[in-house]
Each structure stands twice: as C-alpha cells, then as structure tokens.
Amino acid sequence: MAVQKSRKTRSKRGMRRSHDALTAPAQLSVDATSGETHRRHHMTADGFYRGKKVIEL
C-alpha cells in the first residue's frame, strides 16, 4: 500500500482542490413559441421543443 513520505501542506491541498469547484448552473434558453425559459436541448414544461409540440401533457 502506498504511504506518503511527508504530510501535504494546506497550500498543496488547496491547489489540488482548486479544480473541484462546480461550474455555473445549466445554460437556459427562451422558447420561440411560448417565450418560456427552459434548459438548453430540453423541452419546455408545456411540451414544446424548438417551436414544435413534442409531447402531450
């Protein structure tokens, strides 16, 4: 089993963790038909995608 020779400093730990932060929330788009805000590449809550009704709710 691997065991480190010496303890990592707070600085090195922070540098390693600097890439772990979550990015901004998903991008949003506005539907052309209803003007409703929705996640990109997803249908709106009322069933429209790219201006067409894709599912009956």
UniProtKB/Swiss-Prot annotation:
Region feature Disordered, mapped onto this chain: 1-45
Pfam families according to UniProt: Ribosomal_L32p (PF01783)
GO CC terms: large ribosomal subunit
GO molecular function annotations of the record: structural constituent of ribosome
Coiled-coil stretches noted in the UniProt entry, renumbered to this chain: none
Compositional bias ranges of the Basic residues kind: 1-16
UniProt keyword list: Ribonucleoprotein, Ribosomal protein
GO biological process, one term: translation
Source organism, top-level taxon: Bacteria
SUPFAM superfamilies found in the cross-reference section: Zn-binding ribosomal proteins (SSF57829)
Family of the protein in this entry: Belongs to the bacterial ribosomal protein bL32 family.
Protein name: Large ribosomal subunit protein bL32
Organism in which the protein naturally occurs: Psychromonas ingrahamii (strain DSM 17664 / CCUG 51855 / 37)
Gene name tied to this protein: rpmF
